[in-house]
Amino acid sequence: MVLLYQPKKQKKLRAAFTTIVQDLDYQGLGVAKIQGKTWFIENALPQEQVQVQVIEEKRQYGLGRVQKILQASPLRQTPRCAYYQICGGCQSQHIPIHLQRETKQKALFQRLTKLQKEAIEFMPMISGEAWHYRRRVRLSLYWDAKSKNLKIGFRQKNSQQIVNIRQCDVLDPLLNELLPKLHELLSTWSKPKTLGHIELVAADNGVAMLLRVTEKLAEHDRTLLLDFAFNHQVMLFVQDEKEICHLQGDLPYYQLDDGSILHFDIRDFIQVNRQLNQNMVNTALDWLDLKKKDNVLDLFCGMGNFTLPISRYVKSAVGIEGVLPMVEKARRNGERNHCHNVQFYQCDLSQSFTEQEWAKVPFDKILLDPPRSGAAFALNALCYLMAEKIVYVSCNPATLVRDVELLLKFGYQLKKVAMIDMFPHTSHLESISLFERNR
């Protein structure tokens, strides 16, 4: 018998409904309870009466967006950005910055309070400027052959469409100044279909720019690009299908307060917020309470953002990173900064590392700054190192909670926590935590 395929019927979404918003979650979504179901509503504030368009509905929760504001909150503010309604970037600009921060901090502290009986010292928030804080940006490029128009900007939320922008209020002023000039440059490009994207970084020694193209540069375009880089003092890199070429200027770098200078390649990860990166490093150094006799381990160390400053206060510092090119850069940064008591090793921290030679050293203190996926596997091995203090920098509250539970299980106590508002006007929540081994 032939079984005919019958497509599954799409569940029909309920019609728009009206509700009063009761709360705000840490991602900037309004929260309403309707007949036992929790609804998370985009662009809604507490105490507002809103008409809600349903985006998705599950058994226990639903997701919607404001279709119409029937009664606005006195807290609602006019978004500063001209592209706010269409850009997929900063989605919390209608919320006053103090409320954004208070809501994130409250959510973080409430989650962590439930994990241990002992009191946790909740430290003042680490925050900075709410605008012009981003020193790095990736711009999408799209050539519309029909209108003969090149779009430079960001993708719309939940869409592949590009929002054509001339400025962005969260970018470093040096990057903002270049945006209209990039429009002007690329409008005369001979092969606009070959344009991929642009990455810009406001380094401490100037602006670095990477242009991604799908084929080798035409001579006309290469000349335009080199003239642009020379006239605007831009460190220029071009990436085609085969390689990245450094065409003009020095390697970018940034400097920390202790004098450490970290050189990096244009595509390397660096913290986007210059000011808060420094504040975060200062906090880590303070909480670790470093001594001249200490041996310190820095996991997920990148190019040495924490390792090099740590090394200036201790007997030895060891940095571990999974990506070999980053390890090589960290070593070069250590040499340039005359940090002779620091060593860097490549190791996959999602695999067992207890048999590695570097792991056989008795470490007094440990710092880890893992990716969003957290550090669960690494923590299983860390328990054997018996360090007295661990500082954990997190960029994901969900994996932080999971990893805190592991550390508590392994005999550590959560002593201090501070929220880091690294990305104002977004849903991102970062934090730094101090753990001490139970005696």
Curated annotation (Swiss-Prot):
[4Fe-4S] cluster binds at C81, C87, C90, C168. Signal peptide: none annotated. This is 23S rRNA (uracil(1939)-C(5))-methyltransferase RlmD. Pfam families: TRAM (PF01938), tRNA_U5-meth_tr (PF05958). The active site is at C395. SUPFAM superfamilies: Nucleic acid-binding proteins, S-adenosyl-L-methionine-dependent methyltransferases. S-adenosyl-L-methionine binds at Q271, F300, N305, E321, D348, D369. It comes from the Bacteria.
